[in-house]
């Protein structure tokens, strides 16, 4: 649990730094479309960092459940947001890593789906 919270905290720091960097240093260097893409990456990172913090402090989930959900969320953040950062900060052609961003999105969807499944099990159990 603390490992996941530590990773979430680090990813939160990175999101703040890259958000500020994007707002101040990149605005004049990126096209409006590229800036929008970069801001989307930062926003998704923030949202999923908050979800990671929630999942790992929710007392009704087992450590195994927390770790499983966190695995997909952390992987999704790194692949989804990370690939967008690589494209815009390192000028790597999107064509060369086109598959990474959607793969990250799929991992995020799996993480959300696992969260949904865990809550659904609790609702069904409570209503039985």
Which ranges hold each PLM region?
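Polytopic transmembrane helical bundles with strong interfacial aromatic enrichment
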Residues: 1-128
């Amino acid at each position: 649990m603390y490992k996941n919270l530590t990773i979430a905290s680090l990813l939160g720091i990175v999101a703040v730094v890259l958000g500020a960097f994007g707002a101040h240093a990149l605005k004049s260097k990126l096209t409006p479309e590229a800036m929008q893409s970069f801001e989307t990456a930062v926003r998704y990172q923030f949202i999923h960092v908050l979800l990671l913090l929630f999942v790992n402090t929710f007392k009704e989930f087992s450590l195994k459940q927390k770790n499983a959900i966190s695995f997909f969320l952390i992987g999704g953040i790194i692949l989804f947001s990370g690939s967008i950062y690589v494209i815009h900060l390192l000028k790597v052609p999107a064509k060369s890593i086109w598959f990474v961003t959607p793969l990250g999105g799929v991992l995020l969807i799996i993480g959300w789906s696992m969260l949904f499944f865990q809550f659904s099990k609790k609702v069904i159990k409570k209503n039985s």
